[in-house]
Amino acid sequence: MQNFGAQEMRKGRLAFVRLSKLETLQNLIDKMLAERVFNKGEAADILESNDIRADIARALIDSVTKKGDVACSLFAGAIARQDVVLADAMGISQV
């Protein structure tokens, strides 16, 4: 997996918001909890504060981006394993 930092994540934001599915978003939040990128409160806030799928996607990618390059790299890897089409649209590639 290439190094995929905050700058690259910001470039892929529109594709993420437009193409991500609710199930994928929930799985990604679970993965970020498991990787300790988020705590339970942060994860709950993303889901409970947003009713629309696109708003959940925005909150999720913005929260990860604020956490920095390491968090973005973990997130990119999780996206690549969950949804190849989404990863490709965001410019995430497997090496």
UniProtKB/Swiss-Prot annotation:
Domain CARD: start-end pairs: 1-94
Pfam families hit by this protein: CARD
Example GO biological process: regulation of apoptotic process
InterPro entries listed in its UniProt record: CARD, DEATH-like_dom_sf
Domain of life: Viruses
Name of the protein: Caspase recruitment domain-containing protein 064R
Provenance organism: Frog virus 3 (isolate Goorha) (FV-3)
